[in-house]
Amino acid sequence: MSNNIPAELKYVASHEWLRLEEDGTITVGITHHAQELLGDIVFVELPEVGANLAAEEQAGVVESVKAASDVYAPIAGEVVAVNDDLPSAPETANSDPYGAGWFFKIKPANPADYDGLLTAEQYAGEVD
């Protein structure tokens, strides 16, 4: 797998990635492909901690010099944390999309839903 699509993560077709944490929460961000399409990110709106989101529900917004795009909840659950550094440094979603550029953490309503998401290989097929 390319470094731009880490093998240990899960993905959805709307270009969000998910990482299952040891405590059972799931960290969510936008993929390298998404940030590349958007260009220089200048604004990020995150969901509220405590929000209960349905899968595929709008969870936030990301705006770049080229476009604005919604960020979706890739899995149903409760938002338990947001990346408070991101709104003041939105370019982090460009420079480190799988690390410091994460968007929010969600406690899944049904943890088994995670297993049905796209693997890195499947996501690579979606973006080729």
Curated annotation (Swiss-Prot):
Modified residues (N6-lipoyllysine): 66
GO cellular component terms listed in the entry, alphabetical order: cytosol; glycine cleavage complex
UniProt entry keywords in alphabetical sequence: Lipoyl
Needed co-factor(s): (R)-lipoate
Cofactor binding description: Binds 1 lipoyl cofactor covalently.
Domain Lipoyl-binding: 25-107
InterPro entries assigned to the protein according to its UniProt record, in alphabetical order: 2-oxoA_DH_lipoyl-BS, Biotin_lipoyl, GCV_H, GCV_H/Fam206, GCV_H_sub, Single_hybrid_motif
Domain of life: Bacteria
Pfam assignment, any one: GCV_H
Gene Ontology BP terms: glycine decarboxylation via glycine cleavage system
PROSITE patterns in alphabetical order: BIOTINYL_LIPOYL, LIPOYL
Subunit structure: The glycine cleavage system is composed of four proteins: P, T, L and H.
Record function comment: The glycine cleavage system catalyzes the degradation of glycine. The H protein shuttles the methylamine group of glycine from the P protein to the T protein.
Xref: NCBIfam families: gcvH, PRK01202.1
Family that this chain belongs to: Belongs to the GcvH family.
Protein name per Swiss-Prot or TrEMBL: Glycine cleavage system H protein
